[in-house]
Amino acid sequence: MRNYDLSPLLRQWIGFDKLANALQNSGESQSFPPYNIEKSDDNHYRITLALAGFRQEDLDIQLEGTRLTVKGTPEQPENEPKWLHQGLVMQPFSLSFTLAENMEVSGATFTNGLLHIDLTRNEPETIAPQRIAINERSALNS
């Protein structure tokens, strides 16, 4: 019998509570660029990407349907330095996240090498739970 670990596939689904929990419990290494996904409450999430050395104009964020894509293309220096040690990675990247149906991007900021993308879940009223009033008399015996 074979066991397949699907947790790497689940890490980029945002807005699905079970998948968010799997993310928090996952200890697997992340791909470039490193990122965090925060859940502040049931309807607010934040994706933070660490992009040291990138400039705001090097970045592009697109939302197509439920697919959120972040692309980065750093400016290449005219004279490439001769590195003795290069620990900071400056390479082009494209990172995609699949959002839940009712997730919206509410904003993005780039400060001190960190790109923050804020997400909000807007549940339609037909999906939101409804409160039912409890009466003393039966509605059938009116």
Curated annotation (Swiss-Prot):
Q: Which UniProt keywords apply?
A: Chaperone, Cytoplasm, Stress response
Cellular compartment(s): Cytoplasm
| Protein origin, superkingdom | Bacteria
Does the UniProt entry include the keyword Chaperone?
Answer: yes
* Disulfide linkage: none
Annotated Gene Ontology cellular component terms = cytoplasm
The biological processes this protein is annotated with in GO are: protein stabilization
Checking PROSITE patterns in the record gives: SHSP
Q: Which InterPro entries does the protein's record reference?
A: A-crystallin/Hsp20_dom (IPR002068), ACD_IbpA/B (IPR037913), HSP20-like_chaperone (IPR008978), HSP20_IbpB (IPR022848)
Q: Where is the sHSP domain?
A: 26-137
Q: Which SUPFAM superfamilies match?
A: HSP20-like chaperones
Q: What is this protein for, i.e. what is its function? A: Associates with aggregated proteins, together with IbpA, to stabilize and protect them from irreversible denaturation and extensive proteolysis during heat shock and oxidative stress. Aggregated proteins bound to the IbpAB complex are more efficiently refolded and reactivated by the ATP-dependent chaperone systems ClpB and DnaK/DnaJ/GrpE. Its activity is ATP-independent.
- Subunit and interaction comment: Homodimer. Forms homomultimers of about 100-150 subunits at optimal growth temperatures. Conformation changes to oligomers at high temperatures or high ionic concentrations. The decrease in size of the multimers is accompanied by an increase in chaperone activity.
Q: Domain note for this entry?
A: The N- and C-terminal flexible termini are involved in oligomerization and in the binding of non-native substrate proteins, and are essential for chaperone activity.
Q: Which family does it belong to?
A: Belongs to the small heat shock protein (HSP20) family.
Q: What is this protein called?
A: Small heat shock protein IbpB
Q: What gene name is listed for this protein?
A: ibpB
